[in-house]
Amino acid sequence: RSSINNFDLKYASDAIFGEYLLEEMPDYDGRLLPSREVFILFSTRLFTLLGCLPVNGFDRQLTTHELRYFQYQMAKSVLAGVDAWLIRRGLYVSSYKRRVDLFLRKNEVKPNIKSLVLWSLSMKLNPEPDLLTPIQVSIIYDEVNNFFIREMESGLSWHFKKPISEYSSLRYAILKNPYEVSKICYSSIFRSSSVYLNRYRLIMAQFLLASAWSIKGIDLDLVQK
């Protein structure tokens, strides 16, 4: 099927298990990636925001290993936002450098966003961590979190054809989407499994936690939901 994984496997990979294997795969068009790829990106990259730091990571000096992991996860989150923007416009390509170049050339971004995206590309390709203080960690996390949520909400609005700006609107969109509901029902009825239902619950819980963050303080009302 047409997906980011298959597109990248076809055009950004070496041959696996034989010289001609990739030639046997069908051609994919980056202009025609389905909108659900944005939802998949959103659901798989939420972890980069929630699993990037130890429990007290905002309050102490991180080790070199922790800084490397944190910054690499931040880079993945930003580049996922870039990918979501490109998919919406039929501009997705397999090269990280070309994706970033397209995003910056086709999009009017503020200088701080440009710097954030270029930093993310550098970190993705050469993951050598910068030495950061706890305050700097909080500032970077805040910038990345805001960028990721903004781009993903735009992409999800495009996918679900409904404005997505908060937990309740995403929950409503999922429950009204025939494809997502059919996956939940099929798994529950015919496989006696709640795996898909639990997966959606996890996505919603992660979205709530990510949305609750602010450098000024945590929104406790969202956390309690």
Regions found by a protein language model. Name each.
Residues L121-K124, K225:
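Solvent-exposed interaction patches of small proteins and small membrane subunits
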Residues R1-N112, L125-S192:
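Conserved NTP/Mg2+-binding pocket subregion across the NTase superfamily
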Residues L116:
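Extended ligand-binding clefts on enzyme/binding-domain cores
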Residues S168-A205, A210-K225:
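C-terminal amphipathic alpha-helical interaction region
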Residues K76-I87, W119-S122, R199-G217:
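Short, hydrophobic/amphipathic alpha-helical patches that form generic packing surfaces
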